[in-house]
Amino acid sequence: MAVPKRKMSRANTRARRAQWKATAPNLVKTIENGQVTYSLPHQAKVVTDSAGTALFLEYKGRKVADA
């Protein structure tokens, strides 16, 4: 394992750590039953009834799992 020869300065440490960024997910805007929902592409969506109770999960219009 590599061992640093000298102590790294605070500025260099922070400059190096600044490169570790989280990427924002690409959300897809869909309109269902008059409501705008944002979801991740290629993931199952929760189908709810009018009261907001989760019924099941669907993907590409098919039921894939119970809620």
UniProtKB/Swiss-Prot annotation:
Stretches assigned to coiled coil: none
Basic residues: bias regions: 1-19
Record keyword Transcription present: no
Keywords: Ribonucleoprotein, Ribosomal protein
Segments of this protein annotated with the region Disordered: 1-20
GO cellular component entries: large ribosomal subunit
Family matches, as InterPro entries: Ribosomal_bL32, Ribosomal_zn-bd
Transmembrane domains' residue ranges: none
Disulfide bridge map: none
Gene Ontology MF annotations: structural constituent of ribosome
Presence of keyword Ribosomal protein: yes
GO biological process: translation
Family recorded in the similarity comment: Belongs to the bacterial ribosomal protein bL32 family.
Designated name of the protein: Large ribosomal subunit protein bL32
Biological source species: Paenarthrobacter aurescens (strain TC1)
Gene name of the record: rpmF
